[in-house]
Amino acid sequence: MKILDVGCGANKYEGAIGLDNNPRTAADVIHDLGSVPYPFADNEFDLIVSRHVVEHVPDVMAFVTELYRITRHGGIIKLVTPHYTNPDWATDPTHRNHFNSYSFNTFMADRQVFDFYTEVKLKPVKNYVSLANLWRAVGFEFIVNLDQKSPKFRFTRKFWEFYLSYIFRAKELSFEFEVIKEDSKNGETKLLA
């Protein structure tokens, strides 16, 4: 399995090739993460991990599109980022982007709206919200993430996100997406990217 850790910093994912723009990190490849394309071939990786990076990039659309390009069909992209209600978000002057549970819906293969923005097609595997320690301890994090157990509980996430997230604050979001590069039309399968 070929793994890429994008924005690896000093704690590179075990067994991964590290990509970072800072030469003082554990990176194997130094490259400006805001400058695409990255120095990798199409469909090169089985797994891409990027922890606390997407909030720093200048163009989220270009970033996700580039991760999609270099991940093979059926590969996995894992992103971890602060939730927009995390009070620590504002303590880092290099943070540029805010995210919630629905921020990556534009990239989903089954998207209903905004399908003209991108050719990227991802399938959600995981979308987990980590709440502040107090709310985790009293079980509220479990309730917010019930939609991960069954789609019939989607309302719990949506209700929290839209009405309660500034009271029951989150720390971070963990996303996992499967890359979809094949499209079945008229019984034929063609590679999308």
What are the residue ranges of the model-derived segments?
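Conserved SAM-binding loop
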Residues: 1-86
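S-adenosyl-L-methionine-dependent methyltransferase catalytic module, highlighting the catalytic core
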Residues: 61-62, 66-68, 76-193
